[in-house]
């Protein structure tokens, strides 16, 4: 499960699969409508030469991946030795408009001159629905257009000598006995069928004549719009500017955007710099321009599971934005705060997760528990961490205009909810834990809620709302006092997973959970050097260890999610390893921290990506790749490393 290349501009987002083919195509929201969201919806690339044909998806091709340094421009190199062909595809989503660009360098590796035909296949499921798509050839424009309703995709291209595609076809795909129009390409010729509707695909052909060891280029693009007119306008812009110019402009855009992170990267040890900058870019790639931050756009798992990660969890978003704020980026956080304010419930809390347009995402959390207890199906930590993040942003920028705008409309209702949604002793009432599994008052949620109320009190004071400041600070202190009496298990020498107060008793869940120790010190519920936190991490090292040969740590005991071996504690996650490194840094143990960071650094893919979790034996990536949170936690850990060096 992987997308070794992802490309984005905050409106269009494209995922390239392990065969070098387009396999996720989001527009007009990052993480929203995926017009290529199915196992068989990859956009194929094929080559015909010497009366032989091969698709890149076959095992005969050797495919490698990289990025152009300091950009979100991907490079796919595909070699077929038997055919004597190499394709070098430089891919980008145009930084300024909704267009996917491929600069395809076609190389003849043979000792003789040859005619080579390159076939580009389009296979959309527009707006996530197979019904009622249309593909047409537009003779006046010499393009193909796939469309349905307010979505149009114009297919254009040219060779390096300014010739466009010389054949095309439109056909049915996976319906009425038709496999797809891509089959029409396999004899090297296309039928020029000009229209089809229903479940459709299309192919265009570019013809090249290359001398021995010669090469040429094919420029290919998909321009998207909410109408034919808009998509054609972008198509004409590419023609007028030239596709190479659009690629160069996109490279310039990303290098300018990344310049804010460059001084920090330069201060890091050299072995971390590429991974640091790549992770910053990968976080940015998952941010929709209207504020949502998507957990992952890799939809490979949709073919095996019920859903994808293409949602905005406020928690994941906050962890993704935290290092960007520390680096001095502002636009992304401000857009996210606006997103949160728009989706905030009338009761002052955020829901489980959202689609990038602000609609409620799918959920498995009920309003009524099995014992009849009724409560909103939320994770309270997701509301709390937004307050915490906003306060962090305000502390850095002291933007009083921003505070005046967001205090009454977001901070005050959120903090009022956090302060009031407590039990008779002052602890947060039960909600779902950050892992989305258990309904209880978790240590992690208590910690971030305490921190949020403390920060909200400071924001209230800055705003001039003294009564709210006192009220929220009082609630925070009461919460901390109770927590420090009930959340540590002296028998297991660890902070507990959480508590659930039933009518007759308080039930304590003593499961060892990495988030309990991390949250307790990171958000100030306990001092980092306290006995409770130190012993908790020692217990975590012992209980959640997944191997004697690497430092991988599971999230919690008996974590069944994607676990292959039921005798193991669970799969290790990258964020838990990085949390451990951050605590070492907090304790002044830089050598132990860098050993963990070095190990994570070595597990990155060739394109700098980290998955959600990995196999404890083979170290192969499991679940989505990349996971935005994993990339962000890597950046945060390196920022902590620099901070720790400044303290010493």
Q: Where are these predicted regions, by residue range?
A:
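Low-complexity, Ser/Thr/Pro/Gly-enriched N-terminal "stalk/linker" regions
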Residues: 1-9, 181, 228-230, 243-312, ...
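Extended ligand-binding clefts on enzyme/binding-domain cores
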Residues: 155-177, 345-368, 442-447, 469-575
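Short Pro-Gly-centered flexible turn/kink motifs
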Residues: 65, 114, 208-229
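C-terminal capping/lid segments that line or modulate ligand- or cofactor-binding pockets
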Residues: 1-46, 309, 320, 351, ...
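An extended acidic
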Residues: 1-81, 154-183, 249-275
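Helix-terminus loop motifs that line ligand-binding clefts
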Residues: 65-70, 75-77, 292-302, 311-312, ...
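Active-site acid/base region of carbohydrate-active enzymes
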Residues: 167-173, 178, 266-292, 337-362, ...
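Polysaccharide-binding surfaces and accessory modules of carbohydrate-active proteins
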Residues: 77-79, 83-187, 202-204, 237-260
């Amino acid at each position: 499960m992987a997308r070794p290349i992802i490309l984005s501009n905050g409106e269009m987002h494209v995922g390239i699969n392990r065969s070098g083919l387009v396999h996720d195509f989001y527009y007009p929201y990052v993480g929203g409508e995926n017009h290529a969201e199915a196992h068989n919806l990859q956009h194929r690339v094929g080559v015909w030469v010497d009366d032989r044909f091969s698709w890149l998806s076959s095992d005969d091709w050797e495919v490698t991946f990289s990025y152009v340094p300091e950009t979100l421009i991907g490079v796919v190199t595909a070699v077929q030795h038997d055919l004597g062909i190499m394709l070098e595809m430089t891919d980008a989503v145009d930084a300024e408009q909704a267009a996917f660009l491929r600069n395809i360098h076609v190389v003849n590796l043979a000792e003789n001159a040859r005619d080579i035909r390159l076939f580009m296949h389009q296979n959309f499921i527009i707006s996530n629905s197979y019904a009622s798509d249309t593909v047409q050839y537009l003779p006046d424009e010499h393009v193909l257009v796939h469309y349905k309703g307010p979505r149009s995709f114009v297919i254009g291209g040219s060779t390096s000598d300014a010739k466009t595609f010389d054949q095309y076809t439109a056909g049915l795909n996976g319906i009425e006995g038709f496999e797809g129009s891509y089959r029409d390409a396999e004899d090297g010729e296309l039928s020029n069928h000009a229209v089809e509707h229903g479940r459709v695909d299309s192919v265009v052909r570019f013809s090249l004549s290359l001398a021995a060891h010669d090469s040429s280029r094919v420029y290919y693009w998909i321009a998207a719009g909410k109408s034919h007119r808009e998509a054609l306008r972008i198509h004409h812009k590419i023609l007028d500017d030239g596709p190479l110019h659009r690629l160069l402009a996109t490279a310039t855009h990303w290098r300018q955007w990344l310049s804010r992170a460059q001084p920090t990267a330069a201060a890091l040890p050299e072995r971390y710099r590429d991974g640091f900058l790549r992770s910053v870019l990968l976080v940015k790639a998952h941010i929709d321009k209207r504020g949502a931050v998507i957990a992952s756009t890799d939809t490979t798992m949709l073919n095996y599971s019920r859903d994808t990660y293409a949602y905005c969890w406020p928690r994941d978003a906050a962890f993704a934005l935290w290092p960007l704020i520390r680096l001095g980026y502002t636009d992304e956080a401000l857009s996210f705060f606006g997103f949160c304010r728009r989706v905030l419930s009338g009761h002052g809390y955020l829901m489980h997760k959202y689609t990038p347009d602000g609609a409620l995402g799918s959920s498995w959390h009920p309003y009524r528990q099995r014992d009849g207890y009724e409560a909103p199906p939320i994770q309270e930590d997701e509301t709390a961490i937004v307050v915490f993040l906003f306060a962090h942003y305000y502390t850095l920028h002291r933007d009083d205009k921003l505070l005046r705008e967001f205090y009454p409309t977001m901070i005050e209702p959120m903090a009022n909810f956090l302060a009031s949604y407590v039990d008779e002793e002052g602890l947060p009432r039960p909600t779902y834990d950050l892992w989305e599994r258990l309904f209880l008052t978790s240590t992690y949620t208590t910690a971030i809620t305490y921190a949020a109320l403390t920060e909200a009190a400071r924001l209230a004071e800055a705003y001039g709302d003294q009564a709210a400041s006192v009220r929220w600070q009082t609630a925070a202190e009461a919460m901390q006092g109770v927590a420090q009496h009930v959340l540590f298990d002296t028998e297991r020498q660890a902070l507990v997973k959480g508590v659930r107060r039933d009518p007759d008793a308080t039930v304590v869940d003593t499961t060892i959970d990495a988030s309990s120790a991390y949250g307790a010190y990171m958000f100030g519920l306990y001092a980092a050097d306290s006995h409770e936190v130190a012993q908790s991490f020692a217990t975590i090292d012992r209980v959640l260890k997944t191997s004697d040969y690497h430092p991988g740590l599971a999230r919690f005991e008996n974590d069944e999610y994607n676990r292959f071996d039921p005798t193991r504690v669970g799969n290790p996650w990258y964020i838990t390893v990085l949390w451990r490194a951050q605590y070492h840094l907090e304790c002044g143990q830089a050598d132990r921290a860098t050993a963990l960071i070095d190990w994570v650094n070595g597990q990155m893919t060739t394109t700098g990506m980290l998955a959600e979790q990995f196999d404890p034996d083979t170290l192969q990536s499991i679940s989505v790749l990349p996971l935005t949170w994993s990339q962000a936690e890597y950046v945060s850990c390196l920022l902590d490393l620099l901070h720790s060096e400044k303290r010493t």
